[in-house]
């Protein structure tokens, strides 16, 4: 879980475009964030299993 200060810092606009990085909107994790959903892989998996992300289903082939 990210500190509140880091989450607040991420919400502010960066001075330079190269300083910007993605964080999970739910838990604040900085790595493995899917840009389309703004969620990390852990949170994405939780919400997908619960059926809270529309259009996402478990793959089967």
From Swiss-Prot:
Keywords: Metal-binding, Ribonucleoprotein, Ribosomal protein, RNA-binding, rRNA-binding, Zinc. GO terms for cellular component: small ribosomal subunit. Binds 1 zinc ion per subunit. GO terms for biological process: translation. PROSITE patterns: RIBOSOMAL_S14 (PS00527). Gene3D superfamilies: 30s Ribosomal Protein S14, Chain N (4.10.830.10). Zn(2+) binds at residues 24, 27, 40, 43. GO terms for molecular function: rRNA binding; structural constituent of ribosome; zinc ion binding. Disulfide bonds: none annotated. InterPro entries: Ribosomal_uS14 (IPR001209), Ribosomal_uS14_bact (IPR023053), Ribosomal_uS14_CS (IPR018271), Ribosomal_uS14_sf (IPR043140). It comes from the Bacteria. SUPFAM superfamilies: Glucocorticoid receptor-like (DNA-binding domain). Its cofactor is Zn(2+). Belongs to the universal ribosomal protein uS14 family. Zinc-binding uS14 subfamily. Part of the 30S ribosomal subunit. Contacts proteins S3 and S10. Binds 16S rRNA, required for the assembly of 30S particles and may also be responsible for determining the conformation of the 16S rRNA at the A site. NCBIfam families: PRK08061.1. This is Small ribosomal subunit protein uS14. It comes from Streptococcus sanguinis (strain SK36). The lineage of its organism: Bacteria, Bacillati, Bacillota, Bacilli, Lactobacillales.
């Amino acid at each position: 879980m990210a500190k509140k200060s880091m989450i607040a810092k991420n919400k502010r606009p960066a001075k330079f475009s190269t300083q910007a990085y993605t964080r999970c909107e739910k838990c604040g994790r900085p790595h493995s964030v899917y840009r389309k959903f703004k969620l990390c892989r852990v949170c994405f998996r939780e919400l997908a299993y619960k059926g809270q992300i529309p259009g996402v289903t478990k793959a089967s082939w």
